[in-house]
Amino acid sequence: MQSLVEAIKREGRVLPGGFLKVDGLVNHQLHPALTREMGETFARHFAPLAPTKVLTIEVSGIAPAIMTAAELGVPMVYARKKKPLTMSEQVYTAQSVSRTKGGTVDLFVSSEYLGPQDRVVVIDDFLASGGTLRSLSQIIADSGATLLGLGCVIEKEFEGGRQHLADLNVPIHTLANIVRMSEEEGIVVQAGR
């Protein structure tokens, strides 16, 4: 998605520790027109698979996921990082490692909103090592639903997440691909795949 690539070139920064700072685009501040285009692009890619649900994780995945779900005309469900008191007792859970939070995170999805009848596309903000997407795919498997594909706004190609998820045998679609990055060189980004 060329508009996203250009926005990353303009606004993205590399922080110490190998973190990509794009919070002015996808993690903290959002540009509605850009986010809408993300949803339209994902929807065009995944619509032929006939999904019935879009799944993501709170918080940063919600915006592109809801735009995708709106374009597809299906509900969007997000995995919670804490189980609220109001959530039903029957939940699907998985653990995920969060580099930005510095530890593991428990994920919860109510069985009320995900089950064997569902055909699911996962939309998230980043594909790095693939750990979060692996956790969401486990929740889908535990629910009996069918995983149709994975979509991520930004892929950090050099972290190998796509290869780590190859055994899921589903299409992986990204909108922007970080080929490499460093504090010295900056960000080398191209259209996703």
Swiss-Prot record:
Converts the preformed base xanthine, a product of nucleic acid breakdown, to xanthosine 5'-monophosphate (XMP), so it can be reused for RNA or DNA synthesis. The keyword Transcription regulation does not apply. The gene is xpt. CDD domains: PRTases_typeI (cd06223). One of its GO terms (cellular component) is cytoplasm. The keyword rRNA processing does not apply. PANTHER family: HYPOXANTHINE/GUANINE PHOSPHORIBOSYLTRANSFERASE, XANTHINE PHOSPHORIBOSYLTRANSFERASE. Keywords: Cytoplasm, Glycosyltransferase, Purine salvage, Transferase. It holds the Pfam family Pribosyltran. One of its GO terms (biological process) is XMP salvage. HAMAP family: XPRTase. Homodimer. It catalyses: XMP + diphosphate = xanthine + 5-phospho-alpha-D-ribose 1-diphosphate. GO terms for molecular function: xanthine phosphoribosyltransferase activity. Its EC number is 2.4.2.22. Xanthine binds at L20, N27, K156. Belongs to the purine/pyrimidine phosphoribosyltransferase family. Xpt subfamily. 5-phospho-alpha-D-ribose 1-diphosphate binds at A128, S129, G130, G131, T132. This is Xanthine phosphoribosyltransferase. Pathway: Purine metabolism; XMP biosynthesis via salvage pathway; XMP from xanthine: step 1/1. It is found in: Cytoplasm.
